[in-house]
Amino acid sequence: MPSTSMIEDRGEIERRRFEYLDHPADIQLHSWGTTIERAFEACLVSMFGYMTDLEKVEEQYEFYWKVSGDSMDGLLFQFLDEALNSFHAEPCFVAKRVEIMRFDKEKLEIEFRGWGESFDTSKHETEADIKSPTYSNMQIIEKSDRCDVYVIVDI
């Protein structure tokens, strides 16, 4: 199966709830869901999917995180950055699936977990190295039946 970053089939893109948009120097992640929680989850999975083929990632163990922010954009940044730090440092965790267990919009806190495994160069291919999410052109668009999230990541 082609990597997530190469999928162009609209049906498959809709099923996954994310796509990659061209950007002059980096890449823009666009994710969506029926709620802000589902859109954030899809955004995080899309970030991992841009770095490696998630079809080759097994759900071997769970990893837990808790983050807070000073704004909704800051919360999204911390959400992505904390998970990315778990990929860049031991145990080099890559999540195939993510679930937000608690999303407090007033306190700007998220507790979440991911299912995946440690990145293994003998099993997983590196497709891109994401250094960090950015605030550049970050957008969270909430409507009554859908939330869209746009994040440019530094590669």
Curated annotation (Swiss-Prot):
Component of the tRNA-splicing ligase complex required to facilitate the enzymatic turnover of catalytic subunit RtcB. Gene3D superfamilies: Archease domain (3.55.10.10). Ca(2+) binds at residues 26, 154-155. GO terms for molecular function: metal ion binding. It comes from the Eukaryota. The lineage of its organism: Eukaryota, Metazoa, Ecdysozoa, Nematoda, Chromadorea. GO terms for biological process: tRNA splicing, via endonucleolytic cleavage and ligation. The keyword Calcium applies. It comes from Caenorhabditis briggsae. PANTHER family: ARCHEASE, PROTEIN ARCHEASE. One of its GO terms (cellular component) is tRNA-splicing ligase complex. Belongs to the archease family. This is Protein archease-like. Disulfide bonds: none annotated. Keywords: Calcium, Metal-binding, tRNA processing.
